[in-house]
Structure formats: C-alpha cells, structure tokens
Regions:
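Short hydrophobic/Thr-rich beta-strand motif most characteristic of the beta2 strand and flanking loop
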Residues: 26-34, 41
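Positively charged, aromatic-enriched patches within helix-turn-helix-type DNA-binding elements
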Residues: 153-222, 227-230
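His-Asp phosphorelay/catalytic-motif detector in bacterial-type signaling
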Residues: 2, 46-48, 71-76, 197
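Basic, amphipathic DNA-recognition helix from helix-turn-helix-like DNA-binding domains
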Residues: 66, 70, 75-141
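Active-site beta3 strand of CheY-like receiver
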Residues: 46-51, 56
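Short, Lys/Arg-enriched segments at the junction into DNA-binding effector domains
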Residues: 4, 115-168, 172-179, 185
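Charged docking surfaces used in two-component/phosphorelay signaling
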Residues: 16-24
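Acidic catalytic/metal-coordinating carboxylates
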Residues: 33-34, 60-63, 87
Length: 235
C-alpha cells in the first residue's frame, strides 16, 4: 500500500495506538502532536487521508480541517471526546467527511479509513481523463446545474463547483432521483453504505455544505429542497 495517512492528536498514547493499527494494515503513517507540524507535512507530502483530533494545543482541529480543505480534497476524519452535536456538525460543515467519538475501537477507525479511501480512490479514478467513455446516462443537467458521473465534475451556471467525493455522491443521487423525496436514511445508506442512526446529523450537515457552495438561499433553495419530516428532493 502506498497510501499515506496523517494522524494529528496531542494524546500520544492514542496517536501511537492508531499508528500501530494502520501500519499493521500496510498504510504509511505521518504522525504529529500539534497542528503546525501537521500543516507543514500537508504542504510537503502527498497524503491520502487525515485523522484530526478536535482538541490540539496550538489550533483546534476544526480550524486545522478548514485550512487543509482550502487546497486539498482527500478525506478527513475527526476525533472528538465531546459528544455534543455541535462538534460533529461544525466539523462536517468545515469539510470533514466523517467523525468518531473517543473512546473508540481502533478496528472501527481502521474500517472507516478503508471506506473513505475506497470512495476517494474511485472518485479520482473516475475523474481521470479517458477513464470512461462519455455516456448520456452519466450526465445530468437541471436548470443550469450540470453534473457528470464519468468526470466527477459539477458545474453551476458554467462555474465549476469544488465538491468532495461525498458531496458529489449526494448531489448525484438526488439528481438521479429528481422529483422523488429521498429520506435521510435512504441517502445515508446509498452514499455511505452503512446503517443510518436516528441521532446522525451527517446527511443534514453535508446538505448544508452543498447549499452553501451552490450559494442557495437558506429559506428558499432553488435546487436541494427540504420536505420537512420526510427528506430532500431536487425538482
């Protein structure tokens, strides 16, 4: 395996434990106990995924996540000891792809790393020129919104939208099922491939981030509409 995983956690015992489990799976690991050194690594090396703790000595993990997202699209998993929803929502809104609360099972974290990497690799493979023949079924156009599954690119009024693999898959699924109301449960299962939990706000926060990138009016979105108590739809 050539994938490089960044670990940033000021709790050395946790960082060391995660490092051991990931190395046992064949991953290369770059481990740091503060944000400054981690950011320097991000700019120097080609990374495949980052695992960021929320509480760091020199910068909170959410700020670190936002700084990484300014120039990089690789998956980010947040670690937090606080279970308040605001932590999870803030992390995902700033660009994280997943989160896991402490204490956690290292095997679960490893499984999530593999899941995120698989999606990211598929995303990059599909985005390579010539990786797939153009097929009308792989392209959807709705009122100035153009989305291509073969190139994994989105355009709104001819301006390209910078979206993560998760955001792309959410938008594609909603466009593909245009006119239908898709529940959070169905959307989560289709995009993440996991069982949905009632307390899970992941779908909501990714929808909010997509709307923000599409410059949608919060109260009257043009594209992704909420059907309260039911789900989301693109008409």
């Amino acid at each position: 395996m050539n994938e490089k995983i960044l670990i940033v956690d000021d709790e050395q015992s946790i960082a060391d434990l995660v490092e051991v489990y990931l190395q046992n799976e064949g991953f290369q690991v770059r481990k740091f106990y503060n944000a400054a050194e981690a950011l320097a690594c991000v700019e120097k090396e080609e990374l495949s995924l980052a695992i960021l703790d929320v509480m760091l000595p020199d910068m909170d993990g959410f700020t670190l996540c936002r700084k990484i997202r300014e120039n990089h699209l690789f998956p980010i998993i947040m670690l937090t000891a606080r279970v308040e929803d605001i932590d999870k929502i803030t992390g995902l809104t700033l660009g994280a792809d997943d989160y896991i609360t402490k204490p956690f099972n290292p095997l679960e974290l490893t499984a999530r790393v593999k899941t995120q990497l698989r999606r990211y690799i598929q995303y990059n493979t599909a985005a390579q020129p010539g990786s797939a023949c153009q097929n009308p079924a792989d392209e959807i156009s709705i009122r100035g919104l153009f989305i291509s599954k073969s190139s994994h690119k989105c355009f709104l009024n001819e301006a390209e939208l910078t979206v993560t693999p998760i955001e792309f898959n959410i938008l594609w699924y909603l466009c593909e099922h245009r006119g239908s109301v898709i529940s959070s449960e169905e959307l989560f299962s289709a995009v993440w491939g996991e069982a949905y939990l009632d307390s899970n706000n992941t779908v909501m926060t990714h929808i909010a981030r997509l709307r923000e990138k599409m410059k949608e009016p919060p109260r009257k979105p043009k594209f992704i509409k909420t059907v309260w108590g039911v789900g989301y739809t693109i008409e």
